[in-house]
Amino acid sequence: MTTEHLSQQRFADLPLHPQILAALNDQNFEYCTPIQALSLPLTLQGKDVAGQAQTGTGKTMAFLTATFHHLLTHQPDFITNQPRALILAPTRELAVQIAHDAESLAQTTKLRIALAYGGDGYDKQLKTIENGVDILIGTTGRVIDYVKQGIIRFNDIQVVVLDEADRMFDLGFIKDIRYLLRKCPAPKSRLTMLFSATLSYKVRELAFEDMNDPEYIEIEPLQKTGHRIKEELFYPSNRDKMALLMTLLEEEWPERCIIFANTKHRCEEIWGYLAADGQRVGLLTGDVAQKKRLALLKQFTDGELDILVATDVAARGLHIPDVTHVFNYDLPDDREDYVHRIGRTGRAGESGMSISFACEQYAMNLPAIEEYIGHHIPVSQYDPDSLINDLPKPYRIKRNHTIPHSSRDYKKR
């Protein structure tokens, strides 16, 4: 891992609580990333922050460090088993990842963490919360469920964090977010932080209504895609699209890659071809059960799978190390999703490769994407006669059977 992505700001030179510094030292964190270097001097003083920085630049540790520090330095004069900090994420996977990243800080400080997300573990999550929690990390639906049942009260909240804030304030979340924030103490009585790779003016305007004179921080505003990510664009016909993907996989031979498509059906089709070709490939779509979803991500992270085929459920916030390639089999309909997708590679100072297909169906999305990222994606040509022409017969997922989540789960029937 390179250190070029770090700033000259040392954690040890910040007025951090000694237990926080000890935890950071144990993880060999010496220098801040730019978003940490700009946000921590403010949040450590109790000032609200809305931070925008590229994916993989340390936003999670920025708000976790500030959250733990604030709780340690603002101890209440009463005993409570109710949460003192609320961290909200748009997806279950991201909530789990945040909790994982917080473990080392929790072990050192003895602050209690609990998760609350839908789709799995209702009773287990409930028991953990009832035993007492300092920092609650979760998704809006499950958190609201516990609030309405009277299990959780937010009277003692001192810190609120919205991670991937632009998605949180999407039309589907805004009412839930405002419901929860109205249950918390007033903005002047708490520290509130927003972080995201994309943060539009409209979102900032909505968010600032529930913040206390926040400071807006933006890192590398002129380049929304990481400068360590090499981008490449092909214009395949629909007929050539799968053959081009298989050919590029053979030529590039990526160590670990994610292939994004816009629909579950398309992801299943891609998975079917790659699994039939003998690739170690996993399938991550919205209907994969939560336990399988987490197991699949662990297999991919641990190197048991080389390729992950996914819808945008995997594009936001997940910290999957050493992803060398990202393929946009379909150009996303939402231009911001392009940034989040290719941000799966080129993380923490490493280089990466992004290859996109502007096919007949989705080429119309390209102008909006290029306008948003501020540059044209370099175009490469291909020779149709040089593509792999003996594609395997793809595996098909039968709807009356359990959907396999990786190629090794597949059995021919």
Curated annotation (Swiss-Prot):
InterPro entries found in the cross-reference section: DEAD/DEAH_box_helicase_dom (IPR011545), DEAD_box_RNA_helicase (IPR050079), Helicase_ATP-bd (IPR014001), Helicase_C-like (IPR001650), P-loop_NTPase (IPR027417), RNA-helicase_DEAD-box_CS (IPR000629), RNA_helicase_ATP-dep_RhlB (IPR023554), RNA_helicase_DEAD_Q_motif (IPR014014)
Residues engaged in binding ATP: 53-60
Keyword Heme: no
Highest taxon, organism lineage: Bacteria
Compartment annotation: Cytoplasm
Domain Helicase C-terminal span(s) in chain numbering: 241-388
Limits of the Helicase ATP-binding domain: 40-217
Segments carrying motif Q motif: 9-37
SMART domains, sorted: DEXDc, HELICc
GO cellular component, one term: cytosol
Keyword terms, alphabetized: ATP-binding, Cytoplasm, Helicase, Hydrolase, Nucleotide-binding, RNA-binding
Gene Ontology terms: biological process: RNA catabolic process
CDD domains: DEADc, SF2_C_DEAD
Catalyzed reactions per annotation: ATP + H2O = ADP + phosphate + H(+)
Entry's Gene Ontology molecular function annotations: ATP binding; ATP hydrolysis activity; RNA binding; RNA helicase activity
Pfam families: DEAD, Helicase_C
PANTHER family documented for this protein: ATP-DEPENDENT RNA HELICASE RHLB, ATP-DEPENDENT RNA HELICASE RHLE-RELATED
Family to which this protein belongs: Belongs to the DEAD box helicase family. RhlB subfamily.
Subunit structure: Component of the RNA degradosome, which is a multiprotein complex involved in RNA processing and mRNA degradation.
Protein name in UniProt: ATP-dependent RNA helicase RhlB
Phylogenetic classification of the source organism: Bacteria, Pseudomonadati, Pseudomonadota, Gammaproteobacteria, Pasteurellales
